[in-house]
């Protein structure tokens, strides 16, 4: 049972990195226990945490009960409060049994309401093929009185005597909830039959709606009231007559929908104020919002709190195995452990562990245009019509036979002609370009920060006091058209600058969240039955020996904490809630015969064979506040000895995306997207510029053999100031920092720039997530070049942004650039004035071009190791660390230089420490714990 010590960098157990206890601990174990471990290795293998099925023993077993591998414990006490659900169990481990705490799990049933903001699909489910401006058959009454009737009369009937009411009366009397049928039309093909318009009557169904209401067909819904599909129980019939009132032309069936018409998944994008009297606007589907439990049920169990979120103790000792530490990393440790044990991109059904991820094309905009292909056309269904405007009039022609050198006789009988001149009439549709632009607008522009959006006309969040974290608000904000479009960084592989600091995991293309949402079904209301693992004990299998124990946990009920949404809206404000109806504990027992079990119990009762379990990251975490606009952070750590210290890992978090530490219910947490602090969805690593580590000693650390000065780690360097060429990989990361990350991830430093031999797939490692980028663009310091793209919206209630019309591109073929991008096409065809060409003979000159470089490194913690495996640190001992640091007390100052951000953030620091809990069970019903931690002892704040 080798002592595997977690490495902070990739959370991979690596023996050579830990110098405290040596490479193994077998020397401390009794010979009998070593033999037992060898014989039963499959029970205890860390990388086989969820073990293969083991056949229960058949000999030396006296009762059938002893062969059962899994037993259900019902709670002896529950406490259901508005914000939490507490369960307490009395766990009885019988004689000859050994309970594996690491493999136990909670079996939970309940009812979940994901709230009205839940929308697990894109587009609309109601008339999705209707044009966005299309109006359904409407009957509108307004003051005056004035009645406006608009629509199609699609049902026909035989009406040979037009001044006779009989045929029309029959149609009026047949009007019902299904007659006339809105799904039927005349049923005539234009070329197959030409109806005699004097012998037919027409009937249509019309909806009476509010004059000020929405009338568009796209997204319109009225619920049925009968099993035949009728949507109203009452129909009002009207007769359709000619202007003289003598000829019966047809009938209308009018149903009143003023109270029943709804738009469940769409919203009206109103035109700008100046056009509101002459433009009815266009429809837009509400944004998709997948909502499900978090990856591995993060935050469902109340972890990491100083108020004793979990309790495991025995009858005779009140000590709690669940050590109360607010800086533990239970959730994040579990993420890293799974990533090291298996692929995070498989086995999604287990423990809800569909990992958060994002579509790379959304994060890094690879704008290689579109595949043009040959022209694509749309044709009339019958394939006939006037193809040319200038041609002979063929409407009243006669056809003659062929005679002698001239026409013959006119063709006998009735001859009907429908002839047109020219090619088949058509409309060209650039499907590839339109599809590409749709992707850009719905996947990138829609997720721009709110400061690059403006409100549609009629929506005033300030006056109406609408919280910007609500789903209602998000659907009524539209992006500036020019920030990202088909021409943005054309030809480059470059993330949209305005999107770099936006959480890419809060997206409907987060496949893991989408899976977890779909696992619960497609209704906002669902009954769930889930299995939640015991993360606290999952690292080491804490084996409970025979006795009676009290086990207690608190389950959260805050929807923002336990649920995750792709939009990150405030689920509490949007009406989501959860009710637990049953929480049982499923306990797993070792399938061993009595002799083996008794021998194991005797050995584990021995104090020399105590069990240990540890936080997998082996780290103490701390959050340091960085105010909005700040670029500097200083961390002062009081003097202490640094034995057991393995290094620093750090990244950056948004304050709005980080709940209050240790809070069971954080009132100010109005966010439900990914929580990087808990789930590892880091995405702000690129905002660090440099880091320095200074000890109060004359010895430089980590030495002078790196490219840059001692104590300073320059993470990135602007291209303009990199005259020495210290950056690499076509980005602004320094060679020195690249070396440090290669060292801490793959133990490759002086081996050169090469790949590591390990074939294991790491989810959270450096090279997998390192994404360098470069591009060129116009130098707008040149007075002859003009930056036409404005990214600052004007705050008004007109629904228009005139600055966007500076750009002319696709004029006449899209909505006006100053209008919301979802409105209808306007304008005239015109030569484009943007972007400046960077290719071909017309490219702007080289002295007008500037180079841009940057990188992203999501899902990753920057790491600086403090170990002999890193680099020179002065005189080393066999413990692998300079005695100046390990044997003497020194204070430390860490300085960060960061990119400014327009909101409050935290620097998230993980200090690699020796952190272990030792558990001893000397006799029945006794649990004794000893807690070891260095260099940061329990409760010490940095």
From Swiss-Prot:
Gene Ontology biological process terms, A to Z: microtubule-dependent intracellular transport of viral material towards nucleus; symbiont entry into host cell
Places the protein is found: Virion; Host nucleus
Transmembrane helix found in the keyword field: no
Keywords, in A-Z order: Capsid protein, Cytoplasmic inwards viral transport, Host nucleus, Host-virus interaction, Late protein, Microtubular inwards viral transport, Phosphoprotein, T=25 icosahedral capsid protein, Virion, Virus entry into host cell
Residue list for modification Phosphotyrosine: 931
Lineage of origin: Viruses, Varidnaviria, Bamfordvirae, Preplasmiviricota, Tectiliviricetes
Entry's family note: Belongs to the adenoviridae hexon protein family.
Further comment: All late proteins expressed from the major late promoter are produced by alternative splicing and alternative polyadenylation of the same gene giving rise to non-overlapping ORFs. A leader sequence is present in the N-terminus of all these mRNAs and is recognized by the viral shutoff protein to provide expression although conventional translation via ribosome scanning from the cap has been shut off in the host cell.
Any one annotated GO CC term: T=25 icosahedral viral capsid
Induction: Expressed in the late phase of the viral replicative cycle.
Role description: Major capsid protein that self-associates to form 240 hexon trimers, each in the shape of a hexagon, building most of the pseudo T=25 capsid. Assembled into trimeric units with the help of the chaperone shutoff protein. Transported by pre-protein VI to the nucleus where it associates with other structural proteins to form an empty capsid. Might be involved, through its interaction with host dyneins, in the intracellular microtubule-dependent transport of incoming viral capsid to the nucleus.
GO MF terms, alphabetically ordered: structural molecule activity
Domain of life: Viruses
Principal location listed in the UniProt entry: virion
Oligomeric form and interacting partners: Homotrimer. Interacts with the capsid vertex protein; this interaction binds the peripentonal hexons to the neighboring penton base. Interacts with the hexon-linking protein; this interaction tethers the hexons surrounding the penton to those situated in the central plate of the facet. Interacts with the hexon-interlacing protein; this interaction lashes the hexons together. Interacts with host dyneins DYNC1LI1 and DYNC1I2; this interaction might be involved in intracellular microtubule-dependent transport of incoming viral capsid.
Pfam families per the UniProt record, alphabetical: Adeno_hexon (PF01065), Adeno_hexon_C (PF03678)
Protein name: Hexon protein
């Amino acid at each position: 049972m080798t002592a595997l010590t977690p490495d902070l960098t990739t959370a991979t157990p690596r023996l050579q990195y830990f110098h405290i206890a040596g490479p193994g601990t077998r020397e401390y174990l009794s010979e009998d226990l070593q033999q037992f471990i060898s014989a039963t290795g499959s029970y205890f293998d860390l990388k086989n945490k969820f073990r293969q099925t083991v056949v229960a023993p058949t000999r030396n077993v006296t009762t059938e009960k002893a062969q059962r591998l899994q037993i259900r414990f019902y709670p002896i006490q529950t406490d259901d409060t508005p914000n939490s659900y507490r369960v307490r169990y009395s766990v009885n481990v019988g004689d000859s049994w050994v309970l594996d705490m690491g493999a136990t799990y909670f079996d939970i049933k309940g009812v979940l309401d994901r709230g009205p903001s839940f929308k697990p699909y894109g587009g609309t489910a109601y008339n999705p093929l209707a044009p966005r401006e299309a109006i359904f058959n409407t009957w509108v009454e307004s003051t005056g009185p004035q009645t406006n009737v608009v629509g199609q009369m699609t049902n026909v009937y035989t009406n040979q005597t037009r001044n006779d009411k009989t045929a029309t009366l029959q149609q009026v009397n047949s009007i019902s909830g299904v007659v006339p049928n809105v799904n039927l039309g005349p049923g005539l093909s234009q070329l197959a039959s030409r109806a005699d318009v004097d012998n037919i009557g027409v009937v249509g169904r019309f909806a009476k709606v509010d004059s000020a209401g929405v009338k568009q067909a796209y997204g319109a819904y009225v619920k049925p009231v009968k099993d035949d599909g009728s949507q109203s129980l009452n129909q009002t019939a009207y007769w359709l007559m000619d202007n003289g009132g003598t000829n019966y032309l047809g009938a209308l069936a009018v149903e009143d929908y003023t109270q029943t018409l709804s738009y469940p998944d769409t919203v009206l994008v109103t035109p700008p104020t100046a056009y509101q009297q002459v433009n009815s606007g266009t429809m837009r589907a509400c944004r998709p919002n997948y909502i499900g439990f978090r990856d591995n049920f993060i935050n469902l169990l109340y972890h990491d709190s100083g108020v004793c979120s979990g309790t495991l103790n025995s009858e005779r000792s009140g000590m709690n195995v669940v050590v109360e530490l607010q800086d533990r990393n239970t959730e994040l440790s579990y993420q890293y452990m799974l990533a090291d044990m298996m692929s995070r991109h498989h086995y999604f059904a287990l423990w809800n562990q569909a990992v958060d991820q994002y579509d790379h094309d959304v994060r890094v905009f690879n704008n290689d245009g579109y595949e043009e292909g040959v022209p694509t056309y749309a044709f009339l269904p019958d394939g006939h019509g006037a193809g040319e405007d200038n041609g002979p009039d063929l409407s009243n022609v006669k056809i003659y036979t062929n005679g002698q050198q001239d026409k013959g006789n006119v063709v006998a009988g009735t001859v009907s002609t429908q002839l047109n001149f020219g090619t088949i009439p058509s409309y060209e549709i650039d499907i590839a370009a339109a599809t590409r632009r749709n992707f850009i607008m719905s996947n990138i522009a829609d997720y721009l920060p709110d400061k690059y959006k403006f409100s549609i006309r009629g929506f005033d969040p300030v006056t109406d006091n609408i919280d910007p974290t609500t789903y209602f608000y998000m659907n009524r904000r539209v992006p500036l058209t020019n920030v990202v479009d088909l021409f943005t960084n054309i030809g480059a592989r470059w993330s949209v600058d305005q999107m770099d600091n936006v959480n890419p995991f809060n997206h409907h293309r987060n496949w893991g969240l989408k899976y977890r949402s779909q696992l619960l079904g497609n209704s906002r209301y669902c009954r769930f039955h889930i299995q939640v693992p015991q993360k606290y004990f999952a690292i080491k299998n804490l084996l409970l020996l025979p006795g009676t124990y009290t086990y207690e946990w608190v389950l959260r009920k805050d929807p923002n904490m336990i649920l995750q949404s792709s939009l990150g809206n405030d689920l509490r404000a949007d009406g989501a809630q959860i009710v637990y109806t049953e929480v049982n504990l499923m306990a797993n027992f070792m399938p061993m015969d009595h002799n083996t079990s008794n021998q194991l119990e005797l050995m584990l009762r021995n104090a020399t064979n105590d069990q240990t379990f540890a936080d997998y990251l082996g780290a103490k975490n701390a959050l340091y506040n960085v105010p909005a606009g700040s670029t500097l952070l200083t961390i002062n750590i009081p003097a202490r000895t640094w034995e057991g210290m393995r290094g620093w890992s750090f990244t950056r978090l948004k304050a709005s995306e980080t709940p209050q530490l240790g809070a069971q219910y954080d009132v100010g947490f109005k966010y439900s997207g990914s929580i990087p602090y808990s789930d590892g969805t880091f995405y702000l690593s690129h905002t660090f510029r440099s880091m320095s580590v200074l000890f109060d000693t004359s010895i430089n650390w980590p030495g002078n053999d790196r490219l840059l000065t001692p104590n300073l780690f320059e993470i990135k360097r602007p291209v303009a100031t990199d005259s020495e060429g210290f950056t690499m990989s076509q980005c602004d990361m320094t060679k020195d920092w690249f070396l440090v990350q290669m060292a801490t991830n793959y133990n490759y430093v002086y081996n050169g720039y090469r790949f590591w031999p390990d074939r294991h797939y790491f989810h959270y490692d450096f090279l997998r997530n390192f994404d360098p980028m470069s591009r060129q663009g116009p130098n707008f310091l040149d007075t002859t070049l003009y930056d036409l793209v404005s990214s600052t919206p004007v705050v008004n209630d007109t629904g228009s942004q005139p600055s966007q019309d500076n750009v002319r591109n696709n004029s006449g073929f899209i909505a006006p650039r100053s209008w919301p991008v979802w409105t209808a096409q306007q304008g005239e065809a015109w030569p484009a004035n943007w972007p400046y060409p960077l290719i071909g003979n017309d490219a702007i000159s080289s002295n007008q071009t500037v180079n841009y470089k940057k990188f992203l490194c999501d899902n990753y913690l920057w790491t600086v190791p403090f170990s002999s495996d890193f680099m020179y640190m002065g005189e080393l001992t066999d413990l692998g660390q300079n005695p100046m640091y390990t044997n003497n007390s020194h204070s430390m100052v860490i300085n960060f230089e960061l990119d400014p951000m327009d909101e409050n953030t935290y620097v998230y620091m993980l200090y690699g420490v020796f952190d272990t809990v030792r558990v001893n069970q000397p006799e029945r019903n006794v649990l004794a714990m000893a807690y070891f931690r260095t260099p940061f002892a329990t409760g010490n704040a940095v």
